[in-house]
Amino acid sequence: MILVSYDISNDKVRTKFAKFLSKFGFRLQYSVFEIHNSEAILSNIENEIQNVYMKSFTEEDSVIIFNLSATCKKTCYGYAKNEETDVF
């Protein structure tokens, strides 16, 4: 599983990036997506960031990708809105 966290100042770029990520996983919080990954999906996301989105980023923008192992434990507190298990 990977977590993608982003802080993008431009509304248009941020919306486009969120729509792009939603093709691969689901939103955990406003700027955090959970993606059940394969090497191909991770490569696709990284290539898209480097080749498309980096051109639009300012010095204030960032994207952080956490590549988590299958043995990582996930604990949720509160009332999560997205409990999807299957992503197509």
Regions found by a protein language model. Give the residues of each.
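Alpha-helix boundary/capping detector
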Residues: L3, E34, S43, N47, ...
